Amino acid sequence: MKPSIVAKLEALQERYEEIQALLAEADVIASQERFRALSKEYAQLTDITSCYRQWRKVQDDMEAAEMMLDDPEMKEMAQEELKEAQSVNEELEQQLQVLLLPKDPDDEFNCFLEIRAGTGGDEAALFAGDLFRMYSRYAEARRWRIEVMNANEGEHGGYKEIIAKVIGDGAYGVLKFESGGHRVQRVPETESQGRIHTSACTVAVLPEVPEAELPEISPSDLRIDTFRSSGAGGQHVNTTDSAIRITHIPTGIVVECQDERSQHKNKAKAMSVLGARIRAAEVQKRQEAEASERRNLLGSGDRSDRIRTYNFPQGRVTDHRINLTLYRLDEVMEGKLDALIQPIVTEYQADQLSALSEQD
């Protein structure tokens, strides 16, 4: 491993031990804010320092095994031990490289999940409903909570559009790779000839960042319309104009919210989604400028940015970004998404490592 990387790891180990001592001090314990901040930093350093300590022990083991190679009686055993230690060393070095990758500060946040029916009419709306159910099951398995912000139901079921907040530690970091175009190939229930139809939906995943980090939105840049709620969930309020539509004039971004009885609550929810969308657009623009020559596994949430195909007749799901095909569609639709998400995360980390080695 490069001396510069070892020096960095040594500095992190020292900081970890320093925080450990600070957390036992009375004045730190007395300050809730400082104690919370240090506890968070301590938790963030735990994995990498634990891995680094294991790596240091393996260096000692390899050194001891190499010294025994000169002893004829111990040589065979030493060779075995050295081979085993070298294998462990290789694994630990890979883990340390991944743990040293720059973290996206947004990864720890809750997120907004937006699903929109695209081409395919009623079938696309039904598929949007299937996708929402899939993500809901996945969230449930991870002990996350889903809070629907706005739902525009399809005429024959499903959704033309649904926006939900996913509440749970690291929700954005896990789901952010789901942004993009999702295509479905299946025989609709109304299809008498048994022909396969192709429909599409778009998914956008945005971090719910703290208010202080949201872009400043001038009230003069907003057009706010009220209207009567409609559809499921809206019947109990459709005698008053409690639903809200906010248009951000400079960007043309429009957000609707009609899920609450109170106009005030609907407006607050709509503003939080609007802030997240404006910030996401700014971040994406910056990332595109910085990495125009490098592929981006993070989908844009744009219809043309097709990331995945779900083929029901063949029970197949394909992720086009990494050419991954699984014949486990039933499991995926029941929310077992890790088999799709983990390979993308691994590939993303490999891209980051490649970019870092290019810099070196």
From Swiss-Prot:
Supply the source organism for this entry.
Proteus mirabilis (strain HI4320)
Q: Which domain of life is it from?
A: Bacteria
**Is Signal set as a keyword in this record?**
no
Function noted in UniProt: Peptide chain release factor 1 directs the termination of translation in response to the peptide chain termination codons UAG and UAA.
- What Gene Ontology terms describe where this protein resides (cellular component)? cytoplasm
- What keywords sit in the KW lines? Cytoplasm, Methylation, Protein biosynthesis
Q: Where in the cell is it found?
A: Cytoplasm
The protein here is known as Peptide chain release factor 1
